[in-house]
Amino acid sequence: MNDQVWLTLAKKINELLKRPDIDGIVITHGTDTMEETAYFLNLTVKSNKPVVLVGAMRPSTALSADGPLNLYNAVVTAAAKESKDKGVLVAMNGLILGAQSTVKMNTVDVQTFQAPNSGALGYVLNGKVFYNQVTLKKHTTQSVFDVTHLNALPKVGIVYSYSNIEADMVTPMLNNGYKGIIHAGVGNGNIHQNIFPVLTDARQKGILVVRSSRVPTGPTLSLIHI
C-alpha cells in the first residue's frame, strides 16, 4: 500500500458514489494496513454513502475461516440505510468500527480490530445492522481535505521514540524532502532529550512536527511546543 494507491482509490470511490444506482461500496483489504487506508478515505471521500472496508485474519483454507462472514457483514453494512453519514467504516468479526478510531490490536486474533478509545459504532447480527452510537468527529463531506487535483502527497516520516533513541535517527529527515514528522513519543507524547534539538531544527526548517504517543489509548495533551 502507498500514497498512489490511496489517491487512485479515493478518486475512484468519489466518482462511483456520484452515480444514483450505487448506494455504497465495499473494499476488500489486507489487514496489515487496513486502518491506515480507512482513515485516509475517511478524510478524502466526499459522499455520505457508506464505504466499508473488510478483510480476513484467517486463510480461506482454515477450519474456521472468518473471511466469508466478514464479507457478508460488510455488504449488509454498506447496504443498510442506517450506515449513511457515519463516515468510512470497518466491518470485522461482527463489529462495525469508525475509521477514525479503528486499531489493529492483535497479530493473529479474529477480534483484532477494535476501537479502544471510543468503542464500536455498532454490530451485525444475523444479517441485521445495529448501531449504538455515532462519531462526532468530522469526516468525509465535512473534511477539509480534497485530493481531486492531487497526484502526490507530501512526504511525512514517523519517529518512534524509545529510551536510547539518538539524534541520528531523525537527522536524515531534515534534508531528504520531508514535509512533516510524526513523533510517536513515550507516555503523553513526551520527547527524549536526545532528539528534542533535532526536532526543533526541523521546525526552523519549516517541517511540521506533530506530537503523538506510542501508548494505544488516551489523548496527547499540549504540554510542550516545538
What residues fall within each predicted segment?
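Short, acidic/small-residue loops that bind anionic groups at enzyme active sites
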Residues: 37-69, 76-79, 204-213
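Short Gly/Thr/Asp-enriched flexible loops that form oxyanion-binding sites at enzyme active sites
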Residues: 27-49, 191-200
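Conserved small/polar residues in nucleotide/adenosyl-binding loops
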Residues: 224-226
